[in-house]
From Swiss-Prot:
GO biological process: translation
Protein's UniProt name: Small ribosomal subunit protein uS13
Single GO molecular function: structural constituent of ribosome
Entry GO CC: cytosol; small ribosomal subunit
High-level lineage: Archaea, Methanobacteriati, Methanobacteriota, Methanomada group, Methanobacteria
Disordered: region residues: 118-149
InterPro entries in the cross-refs: Rbsml_uS13_C, Ribosomal_uS13, Ribosomal_uS13-like_H2TH, Ribosomal_uS13_archaeal, Ribosomal_uS13_CS
PROSITE patterns, per database record: RIBOSOMAL_S13_1, RIBOSOMAL_S13_2
Membrane-spanning parts: none
Similarity annotation: Belongs to the universal ribosomal protein uS13 family.
Keyword entries, A-Z: Ribonucleoprotein, Ribosomal protein, RNA-binding, rRNA-binding
Pfam family, one: Ribosomal_S13
Species name: Methanothermobacter thermautotrophicus (strain ATCC 29096 / DSM 1053 / JCM 10044 / NBRC 100330 / Delta H)
Length: 149
């Protein structure tokens, strides 16, 4: 029986090139990095170098489920991108637009509470204590005028 090859595979609302290896294909999903993609593939029992276009629809659904709920597949909690969620207190793994929306809400909450980090985000300044005397300067440089002859 010959395997059917798909040139485009849809995983987690994202179209992925079927020629990519499993490891590289999963990293193209926002919220899934190299380490998490390797862990998901190994826990699901696939080969890292297999082309993603050769997977059946059931295998793709299983991969998608592993990406959405990595704790079910014995992925350690330190690999999950939203540990101890602010509202629920549980560990979640967010991908694509859910991740972007959650980060935006976090920034808005910091701005609303007028925390130090929130104020720095509002002003467009560095948040993590970097020096600002010479770096993070915005706008055009004044430059030097050339001497007239």
């Amino acid at each position: 029986m010959e395997e059917e090859f798909k040139h485009m595979v849809r995983i987690a609302r994202k179209d992925i090139d079927g020629n990519k290896t499993m490891e590289n294909a999963l990293t193209s999903i926002k919220g899934v990095g190299k380490a998490l993609s390797r862990a998901i593939i190994m826990s699901a029992g696939y080969d890292l170098n297999q082309r993603i276009g050769y997977l059946s629809d059931e295998e793709i659904e299983r991969l998608e489920e592993a990406i959405k709920n990595p704790a079910k597949y014995n992925i350690p909690s330190w690999m999950i991108n939203r540990r101890n969620d602010y509202e629920t207190g549980e560990d979640k793994h967010l991908i694509e637009s859910d991740l972007e929306m959650c980060l935006r809400e976090d920034l808005n909450r910091m701005r609303k509470t007028r925390s130090y980090k929130g104020r720095r985000h509002e002003l467009g300044l560095p948040v993590r204590g970097q020096r600002t005397k010479s770096t993070f300067r915005k706008g055009s440089s004044v430059g030097v005028r050339r001497k007239k002859r």
